[in-house]
Design a protein with these regions (language model features):
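Boundary/linker segments of alpha-helical solenoid repeat arrays
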Residues: 21-32, 87-97, 106-112
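Alpha-helical adaptor scaffolds
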Residues: 6-73
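Solenoid-like repeat scaffolds
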Residues: 49-51, 85-88
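Residue-level signature for tetratricopeptide repeat
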Residues: 2-3, 66, 104
């Protein structure tokens, strides 16, 4: 993205976002299968689902920034809301997503906590 190749960045980030989402869902499913049967497997799978979801959210946030750079706020806003919903407003990435929504004028009141 630093080199300005936004089309390539969009494609790579969309692909990463989709792949990490699939991986997270697979680990969630695996965790559910072993819930109540084998706690270590269930917990390990849940932890891996969370790790993949974090990477998905990182990719989603970066994709939103690419859309901002291309002056496409209508594409950025839904992505930022998805990140905020997943991360919550109290986590670092959630705060960054909300700050972007304020900068875009989608939200009026900055979150200062």
């Amino acid at each position: 993205m630093a080199a300005g190749n936004y089309a390539l960045a969009q494609a790579k980030l969309k692909e990463a976002r989709n792949l990490f989402n699939q991986v997270s869902n697979f680990y969630q499913d695996l965790s559910a299968v072993f819930a109540g049967i084998d706690t270590p497997i269930a917990n390990n799978s849940r932890d891996k689902a969370v790790e993949a979801a974090q990477k998905r959210d990182d990719s989603t946030f970066q994709l939103a920034l690419v859309h901002r750079a291309l002056n496409q706020p209508e594409m950025s806003v839904p992505l930022l809301v998805q990140v905020l919903k997943s991360q919550q407003a109290t986590r670092s990435l959630g705060k960054k997503a909300y700050a972007q929504l304020v900068e875009l004028g989608f939200s009026d009141i900055p979150y200062k906590r």
